[in-house]
């Protein structure tokens, strides 16, 4: 068909443009060490938390993009976003600075920076971030259809309730940075994982009906979360993961002050891969089990791994409460 031939270049250019936008997202990993190095060690968690709170744009997008689409058509959406990005570029150009002291010395090779990746702690931080960021991204994508399928809600109501998870998960990252500076990355991450474990345990339980034989005959009981309890638990989980995203990067600034760029990049990559792979696994699990809450069962198991790993490598050697808990045990 000649129409398909004419549309091929358009599709190809659209794909290339999409890849370019995705590559631009890598600037987040560049910005993390850039921001951190302007602040003393005891304020780096707060600085990176405020910077990382920009992730809340993903939640705001759920409200803004549909409004623009309905009012002006889909072509206006990328135009508006392009204008915002251009404005941000101008502001950055006018008000940002460069300090040569923040640069890696020329005698330090790129391969030397990557040697830190052999450190088992880096793998552990990748695992933590694959939960608090990768899980956040994955569930943000999954929640709307979960509400529609599990509770029969209208898609507009479902999107609004899903924002109760995704919006705090971005905005409150700054508070997580403040807490990490005050109490230490380890203490904040430890409690984040326990709160996640409790929430995911409750969220994992599927809607269940069971019958008990009593002296008066069969008694059927129902166990399951209603939409209000479910949304409340998701909100708590979103807040916990917001704090966790900040505390993981506080670990990095504490343990690798001279190599924040390379380490934060690989940890960020782990989070991005989690956000990509987990929705696929959610769908596969639901197809295999027929249980929608199997997504939370998977996340529950992953959090178990984090808690066990953290206990054997950190908790046994440090306090998580009290005056001696303020510093990372690995710093």
Report the location of each language-model feature.
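Helix-loop-helix hairpin linking two adjacent transmembrane segments in secondary transporters
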Residues: 50-96
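Extracytoplasmic gate region of multi-pass secondary transporters
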Residues: 120-171, 245
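Cytoplasmic helix-loop-helix junction between adjacent transmembrane helices
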Residues: 17-54
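C-terminal transmembrane helical hairpin of 12-TM major facilitator-type secondary transporters
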Residues: 186-248
């Amino acid at each position: 068909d000649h129409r398909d031939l004419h549309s091929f270049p358009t599709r190809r250019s659209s794909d290339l443009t999409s890849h370019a936008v995705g590559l631009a997202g890598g600037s987040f990993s560049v910005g993390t060490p850039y921001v951190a190095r302007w602040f003393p060690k005891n304020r780096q968690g707060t600085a990176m938390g405020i910077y990382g709170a920009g992730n809340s744009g993903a939640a705001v997008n759920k409200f803004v993009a549909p409004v623009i689409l309905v009012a002006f058509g889909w072509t206006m959406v990328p135009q508006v976003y392009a204008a915002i990005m251009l404005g941000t570029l101008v502001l950055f150009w006018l008000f940002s600075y460069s300090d040569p002291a923040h640069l890696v010395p020329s005698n330090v090779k790129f391969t030397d920076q990557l040697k830190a990746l052999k450190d088992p702690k880096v793998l552990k931080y990748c695992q933590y971030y694959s939960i608090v960021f990768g899980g956040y991204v994955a569930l943000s994508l999954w929640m709307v259809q979960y509400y529609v399928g599990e509770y029969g809600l209208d898609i507009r109501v479902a999107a609004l309730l899903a924002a109760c998870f995704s919006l705090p998960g971005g905005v409150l990252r700054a508070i997580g940075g403040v807490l990490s500076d005050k109490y230490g990355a380890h203490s904040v991450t430890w409690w984040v994982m326990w709160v996640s474990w409790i929430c995911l345990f409750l969220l994992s339980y599927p809607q269940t009906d069971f019958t008990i034989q009593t002296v008066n005959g069969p008694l059927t009981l129902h166990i399951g979360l209603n939409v209000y309890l479910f949304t409340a638990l998701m909100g708590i989980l979103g807040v916990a993961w917001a704090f966790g995203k900040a505390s993981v990067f506080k670990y990095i600034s504490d343990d690798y002050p001279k190599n924040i760029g390379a380490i934060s990049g690989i940890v960020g990559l782990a989070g991005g891969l989690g956000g990509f792979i987990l929705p696929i696994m959610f769908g596969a699990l639901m197809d295999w089990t027929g249980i929608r809450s199997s997504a939370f069962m998977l996340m529950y198991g992953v959090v178990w791994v984090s808690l066990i790993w953290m206990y054997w490598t950190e908790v046994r050697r440090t306090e998580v409460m009290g005056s001696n808990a303020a510093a990372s045990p690995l710093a």
